[in-house]
Amino acid sequence: MSVLVATLLFLMAARAPESSAEHADLVLLSAKIWTGDSTRPQATALAARGGRIVAVGSDAEVGKLRGPKTVVVDGKGRRVVPGFIDSHTHMSMGGFNLLAVDLRHTKDPADFTRKLAAFARTRPAGLWMTDGAWDHQVWADPVLPTRALLDPATGDRPACLSRTDGHMAVCNSRALALARVSRETPDPPGGVIVRDARGEPTGLLKDAAMDLVWAVRPARTASEVEEALRIAVRHAAENGVTSVQDLPGNAADLDAWEVLRREGKLTVRVDYRPSLSEWQKARDRRARMKNDEWLRIGGVKGYVDGSLGSSTALFFEPYADDSKTSGVYASEAIPLEKLEARVAAADAAGLQVEVHAIGDRANAEILAVFERVAKRNGAKDRRFRIEHAQHLRRADITRFAKLGVIASMQPYHAIDDGRWAQKRIGLERSRTTYAFRSLLDAGALLAFGSDWDVAPLSPISGIDAAVNRRTLDGKNPKGWIPEQKIGVEEALRAYTSTAARAGFAEKEKGSLAVGKLADFVVLSRDVLSIPPGEIPDTRVDATVVGGQIVYSR
């Protein structure tokens, strides 16, 4: 009897009219979909329901899921790719920079001063001026700015303006006075107070020395941080970025992210990564959080060194343009045993660990640290990451795959730094700079990001940089260190499936397959078939997150 009843119920269900619950919330048709899924790499249509993909296939197959309330997107033959995952962002900093004076594209010191003075006139007296994202390397004469350049433009307003890489700032006399930085102030561990021939501070502070001024700057309010993140979230949608790994953040940033999460204002998924130095707090906060597909703590980030642009990246040999220095260790890597102890403790606590390393010595040192910690803590799927992995010795390239270390890299830096890097480190070391091709050929996992706000958030710009390597000054039309170019599909994977794997999220996103999150991007041009030189002309036409259109051009 029970078998008969079950059979009848099955037949009734099979013959029942299609219910609204079976209809898709969104259907995309007539597209050229690169799914990133090896089981079905190409399709023309997909459907989403409840924020996830319920069908991928042909128009005929997927079109059956249309209902009266289904949002239908006409792909018009355009290229569709999985939502871009940015493996390295500084979202609040990016938001604040969109609100601040933009000094990134100034032409020379005089232009720098003009723009700064014009912005200062819009600011109340006494209010701090920060950010700026200046880059002296774009000037014809790349002389570093000093407080003498700032003082006439800023008046009595304290000003400390960060270089685009975030590893150096130039401060005016008012800010230095408030921080009590003088000729008697010693360089802090991991930092440099740049001085003139008389020993007086020029206003330039490198790495840990910047903290002397940041310590006296009023903290940003919760509402200010929230507004900066709202602006950053909109900017992400405009660029087709559907997920970010946001690092290294502080408690104020995470509090603001949680406010946006509760308000339902998130249109980008956030994998938040606090500082390695606060790994215990990260562990405890993660235990209290919901940690869903919108907001979670994924790991912690540390530092070994500084940056190439600030001459604080750590190398085995001195800089070619300054033989007195080979770079510096970051303060948390002095001594290196301190950093190693934190890596080991965070790893044992179940946190993914990623460490910033730019110079070849910094990369060699952290690879050795990762190897020792893995042996000490035992085998597991830990996915250690090196952020930037910028300058590598040839012998260290193969160690990434051997040790299972992910190279989390930002390709736009290659076409930016490539204008002047060779002057700083010479030709031989440049050959394994941003070594995308060599790392992939050695079997390493390559995850891409932007390092926004240091570089533009645009993944299209990043793909162009990885594929073409044409420097921003136009002097390398065939590519700077062209042997390190990679293909478009390889770059796409670094921004999608491998980026997802770099955050332990490959089961949720990074490719377009049934059951995964319905995050995808509609592009104006087919980056997989157009001449590579035309990639920069590509625009994001639409961004879809969780089956909802969050941006449309």
Name each region found by the language model:
Residues 14, 21-29, 34, 38-284, ...:
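Divalent metal-binding segments
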Residues 343-354, 358-384, 388, 394-398, ...:
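His/Asp/Glu-enriched, well-ordered alpha-helical/loop segment
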Residues 235, 552-553:
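Short, gly/Ser/Thr-rich active-site loops of penicillin-recognizing serine hydrolases
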